Amino acid sequence: MSDDRDIQLEAEKQGVFLTTMQRFYNWGRRSSVWPLSFGLACCAIEMMATGLARFDLARFGAEMFRASPRQADLMIVAGTVTKKMAPQVVRLYNQMPEPRYVISMGACATSGGPFRDGYNVLRGIDLLIPVDVYIPGCPPRPEALLHALMTLQKQIDAQRLNRVRWYGKREAKEYPVPAFGKHGLEIDGKLVDPVGGLPLISPYTSPTHGEMRSGEIEHPELVRHFPIMDETVELESPNKAKGVAPEIRHNDLKRPAVEVDHARDEQR
């Protein structure tokens, strides 16, 4: 083993570098991750700042924001995903060539953020497409986005070509594009995320090593495991939940109680 190492060091002194095909392939992909020009809300402002001279995204080979999904490797979901915008996000993702990656930037893209109890906000983009790296924050700083990019590069370095689906002659996988129906998001005519209700679909897990994930539509009559809410939440109907969210019930929002002085109001 030491003899092989000595031979490699001697060859490097002569300008000859020895490596494996897999490492060389991964090095090329990790060094030229081109993001899609795609922003949704305030997190997109921080994404724009990351591409400026102060943070110098070009050091990582990711400064080439492409205007077409056909030329992009990375989708940065930067901001709140509304249920009307969700079909467009999935459609853009399907148009990206494989291998393709997703960074969920900010609390809104990851779980709905402060708007998660809103009737029109998707509670995490991983309900519809797989996510490789999550960035917490509201909004995250450019340094956090750089750290996410470096994390993604490490994941790319660790990929094995014989395990990933997209290497070879296997067909690319397209994810179902939801339609905004009468009561919310629908896939193949089945309600998966009702307006004002709870998601009826489980999230995808990270595709770091190329395995396929869940994303199964769970039948409304069966017991569901909600990706955000706890399992004690019950539905009165497919469009309405019983009670309130656990965060509100346990006062996790830490909102101070508002006391009203009626006597003072009467004096006025």
Swiss-Prot record:
Residues 247-268 have a biased composition (Basic and acidic residues). Binds 1 [4Fe-4S] cluster. Its cofactor is [4Fe-4S] cluster. Keywords: 4Fe-4S, Cell membrane, Iron, Iron-sulfur, Membrane, Metal-binding, NAD, Quinone, Translocase, Transport, Ubiquinone. It is found in: Cell membrane. It catalyses: a quinone + NADH + 5 H(+)(in) = a quinol + NAD(+) + 4 H(+)(out). It holds the Pfam family Oxidored_q6. It comes from the Bacteria. GO terms for biological process: aerobic respiration; electron transport coupled proton transport. Its EC number is 7.1.1.-. It is a peripheral membrane protein. InterPro entries: NADH_UbQ_OxRdtase-like_20kDa, NADH_UQ_OxRdtase_20Kd_su. GO terms for molecular function: 4 iron, 4 sulfur cluster binding; iron ion binding; NADH dehydrogenase (ubiquinone) activity; NADH:ubiquinone reductase (non-electrogenic) activity; quinone binding. The keyword Translocase applies. Residues 237-268 are annotated as: Disordered. It is an enzyme of class 7 (translocase). [4Fe-4S] cluster binds at C42, C43, C108, C138. Belongs to the complex I 20 kDa subunit family. NCBIfam families: nuoB_fam, PRK06411.1, PRK14819.1. PANTHER family: NADH DEHYDROGENASE, NADH-QUINONE OXIDOREDUCTASE SUBUNIT B 2. NDH-1 shuttles electrons from NADH, via FMN and iron-sulfur (Fe-S) centers, to quinones in the respiratory chain. The immediate electron acceptor for the enzyme in this species is believed to be ubiquinone. Couples the redox reaction to proton translocation (for every two electrons transferred, four hydrogen ions are translocated across the cytoplasmic membrane), and thus conserves the redox energy in a proton gradient. This is NADH-quinone oxidoreductase subunit B 2. It comes from Roseiflexus castenholzii (strain DSM 13941 / HLO8).
